[in-house]
Swiss-Prot record:
Domain of life: Bacteria
Name of this chain's protein: Phosphomethylpyrimidine synthase
Record-linked InterPro entries: ThiC, ThiC-associated_dom, ThiC/Bza_core_dom, ThiC/BzaA/B
Biological role: Catalyzes the synthesis of the hydroxymethylpyrimidine phosphate (HMP-P) moiety of thiamine from aminoimidazole ribotide (AIR) in a radical S-adenosyl-L-methionine (SAM)-dependent reaction.
Family: Belongs to the ThiC family.
Amino acid sequence: MNAPDKFASLLALTREPFPASTKSYLAGSQPGLRVPVRDIQLTNGEVVSVYDTSGPYTDPAVQIDVRKGLASVRGEWIAARGDTEGYEGRVRKALDDGQKAEDGDRLAQLRAEAAALQRQPLRARSGANVTQMHYAKKGIVTPEMEYVALRENGRREWMQQYMQDTAREQRLAGNPLGASIPKIITPEFVRDEVARGRAIIPANINHPEVEPMAIGRNFKVKINANIGNSAVTSSIEEEVEKLVWAIRWGADNVMDLSTGKNIHTTRDWIVRNSPVPIGTVPIYQALEKVGGIAEDLTWEIFRDTLIEQAEQGVDYFTIHAGVRLAYIQLTAARRTGIVSRGGSIMAKWCMAHHKESFLYTHFEDICDIMKAYDVSFSLGDGLRPGCASDANDEAQFAELHTLGELTQIAWKHDVQTMIEGPGHVPMHMIQANMTEQLKTCHEAPFYTLGPLTIDIAPGYDHIASAIGAAMIGWMGTAMLCYVTPKEHLGLPDRDDVKQGIIAYKIAAHAADVAKGHPGARARDDALSQARFDFRWQDQFNLGLDPDTAKEYHDETLPKDSAKVAHFCSMCGPKFCSMKITQEVREFAQQGLQSKAEEFNRTGGELYVPIHRAD
């Protein structure tokens, strides 16, 4: 792999701070609790602070060596609680990386390159429970909860100038559609939401590098990006670079969906270098361990895989425990059958053995593993619809009902839980999904893949799905799983990753504005004001993608002088509506001034006497 050279070149661009941006930190109540924000310096002297997911990669003051991983954020907090213990951990096997021989040259090379990324695993002490939900139910406000509160609030002082018009704010007030969003997020509010199961803070005790974040209906809508190799393409260094690229553009969480070789080592590199929570679908690696033959899967192999990944620091597992034997026949009349990889694997296993899935029958055993490491459940929708004509059918909602039952079992163990959702759903059927999920799953956070609203957009599915994502985000979904232009077509590269993330940042932000999340619209107002003032650089820099905005502008007006011009190439200097509006305002102001002078000349009386000739 020659990791040092390849990573150095791949990460060079990704470490560049955004234009006119600097990293700053909000201080918490205890030493070491520092929450990052990105400050955008405007040409008029204003500073706009925005939520930041890029971790230390965009902080020039931080030295990063990806061969060793990121510095710990939470290590001292975890140790201070006194309820964990270090231990030797399971023995790493060649099969973990898809290798058959323990003494192979390739395996030795992989392990040597990842040697500095190894950590002694932690687990809960005997009889202890180390989940954020457990602490929350006991009334404990953890540093992670305070971190989340500071992060959700951000630095709000700059917003006030855009929120002073009371009439405007009332006119534009959002509709939360049943959500309960306070004006200020307090640590106690975070604790209460986690205790109720309405929010999760995915943060494995073996992932101390993670910057805590919350997924819940009453917080900002989050987005997830998927990366991972396949049996056909990609490499470890490419996947790590995709991770850093994804969080640069705004991915709140990242899932490693690797299905090819070197799965274990790829995950070492990803987790140790990730400041955001990492999720996986453990059944993928378990399937690799049995040569891709679903029928050969066993509970013992799956259990070993869960512990393996929990020790590495994975923050949440997608587990398709809701795929029950009786539900499989409900998919027979579908146009596209079972489209979830995990769902199809478990369906095949159930049919081959003609009994319930071991994920379902051993669910409480899985809970015991989850709570020992604080791994969150992402209960998978293995029977989600794969096309619009299969949406909201009996199979989909039967599984959802089971996921609601499993959620209550997980909560009995104080295991944090979110619910995965579709998929492909026409616009007029989206609300029914949200309503059913809130009722059936007891307000556990909903995490949806889109949904795609139409099926005729190959190459543009990121747009077709962002429409549904914006809608369901407004209705109450807590996290949106991005879709890239390559959906249904192939493994996304870094450009596809960026396009998918930007589409979903748009959807999530639109949902926050519609819900009336405090201050959500202020950045829009700042950009609108920059646009009206013809502050082109500020327009670029306030956008979600400054690079593309500047590139499009400069295709026709590349000179520096165009950055202060009061027009663009769309309308030119004579037909710019904003320039004309400014001129109209100037004329109106001049007219008012003229009338004021006339008023003063006539004596300053409101009513001027009329002198009539006798």
